[in-house]
Design a protein with these regions (language model features):
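Glycine-centered tight-turn motifs at strand-turn-strand junctions
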Residues: 1-8
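Generic detector of short alpha-helix boundary/capping microenvironments
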Residues: 5, 13, 36-38, 169
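A glycine-anchored, Pro-Gly-centered beta-turn/N-cap motif
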Residues: 8-16, 26
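Mature extracytoplasmic or organellar-lumen-exposed domains after removal of signal/transit peptides
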Residues: 16, 23, 30-32, 63-197
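Low-complexity, Pro/Ser/Thr- and charge-rich linker/hinge segments at domain boundaries
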Residues: 29-63
C-alpha cells in the first residue's frame, strides 16, 4: 500500500504545461509556464540532480508498494487455505511465517503508524528520505545519496527473498491448492495495481 510520502508528487520542472480542468461536460484548458526563481542560488545542474533522484525514489516507492501488495495478497490466500484445513502442511506453515517475516522487514506492522509504531522499516525509511530530498530544490547531499543506495541494497535483498519464496514454498503451496481444488491468489499486473492505488 502507498503511504503519505507517495502522495507528494515530484515537483514540475521549468517549462510549458497545459492545464486541463473538467467541470461536468465543460473542459477548460490553459497553458502555463513554470519558472525557477531567477534570484535562486541553486544551479540548473543541482536542480536536475534533485529531480533525477526524486524520480528514482518515487519509482522505488511504487516498486515497494507492489511487493507489499503481492505479499499481502498471498498471505490472505494462505490464511484462507489454512482455515479450511484440519492441519496445515509444514510447507504452508513455513510459507505463512516467511510472508509475515518479509512483511515485517518491508513495513511497520505494529502500532497505528503514527503513535507507538514499531521501529521504522524500509517503507518508512524510504518515505523519510523521499520527503527530505523531494522537498528541497537543490542537489541531495552525499550522505543522503548514501542513504538512498543503502535502501536500494536492502530492497534488492528483500526482492531476492521474495524470488526464493516464489520458486520454493509458494510454488509448492500453489500445487497444494490445486490438489484441494482451491484457487490461488490473483495478482494484478503492476500497471493495474498502480493505476488503482
Amino acid at each position: 500500500s502507498f503511504s503519505g510520502a507517495a502522495m507528494m508528487s515530484p515537483t514540475a520542472k521549468a517549462g510549458l504545461y497545459k492545464v486541463r480542468i473538467t467541470k461536468g461536460s465543460e473542459v477548460f484548458e490553459k497553458q502555463i509556464e513554470v519558472k525557477y526563481d531567477p534570484n535562486s542560488m541553486i544551479t540548473q545542474a543541482e536542480r536536475d540532480q534533485q529531480h533525477k533522484v526524486t524520480m528514482e525514489l518515487f519509482d522505488f516507492i511504487e516498486e515497494l508498494a507492489y511487493l507489499v501488495y503481492q505479499v499481502d495478497t498471498w498471505d490472505k490466500n494462505v490464511e484462507e487455505h489454512v482455515s479450511s484445513q484440519p492441519k496445515p502442511s509444514k510447507n504452508t506453515q513455513a510459507l505463512a511465517a516467511a510472508l509475515d517475516g518479509l512483511r515485517e522487514k518491508l513495513v511497520v506492522t505494529s502500532g497505528d503508524n503514527y503513535v507507538g509504531a514499531g521501529e521504522p522499516r524500509l517503507r518508512e525509511k524510504l518515505n523519510d528520505i523521499y520527503m527530505v530530498i523531494g522537498g528541497y530544490p537543490g542537489a541531495p547531499s552525499s550522505s543522503q545519496l548514501e542513504t538512498v543506495q543503502a535502501l536500494k541494497k536492502e530492497f534488492q535483498d528483500h526482492q531476492k527473498t521474495w524470488a526464493s519464496l516464489q520458486s520454493g514454498e509458494l510454488k509448492k503451496f500453489t500445487a497444494e491448492l490445486a490438489k484441494a481444488n482451491r484457487p490461488p491468489a490473483v495478482i494484478k499486473p503492476k500497471e493495474v495495481f498502480l493505476k488503482e492505488s
